[in-house]
Amino acid sequence: GGLGIFIKNSINPTKIEVAVFNPNLNAIETSSASEFIATNEINTQNLTLESGSASNIILTTNTAALFVESSSASKQNITLNGNKNTNVNIESSSASTVKIEGIAGTGNYDSSSASSIKAGDLQLQNATTSSSSGSNIKVFAIEKLNANASSGSSTKLANKPKELQIDESSGTSIN
């Protein structure tokens, strides 16, 4: 099931605040300039976050698997209290921004269309990145990083991993 919150017959922007209590939260989706703020840490096995259309998600989580999708000028600000077994997958597109910090094991980042993944403060063991079309990624990988950049995009390294594999085309940078 899902919880939908709407203002009936309203065309004027109206700020409303809603308190929700759910001990089994495993997915959050925002759109249309809405904002989701978790006041307490979300503890769950798997967590999926999807934001679009200039919406925002702000939270702290302790999860074994995190999937993040951000598009259409939306923003996400995530603190992850994971461990070396935590998997993180982030996809950003269309001028959206995902900022994430904390600790995890493996990360897969995919950015496109002028979006940003700001993950220089998320300490990973291993990471794979793919940036394209004017997007950018900042990444922190301790052991291994596979980085791919194309079409005017960039990948910035917050540290130097033990093993680095780079695939970049002209007009891009990985450094």
Regions found by a protein language model. Name each.
Residues 76-175:
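Short, surface-exposed interaction patches in beta-rich subdomains
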Residues 1-52, 58-71, 77-89, 105-107, ...:
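Acidic (Asp/Glu) and glycine-rich low-complexity loops/linkers
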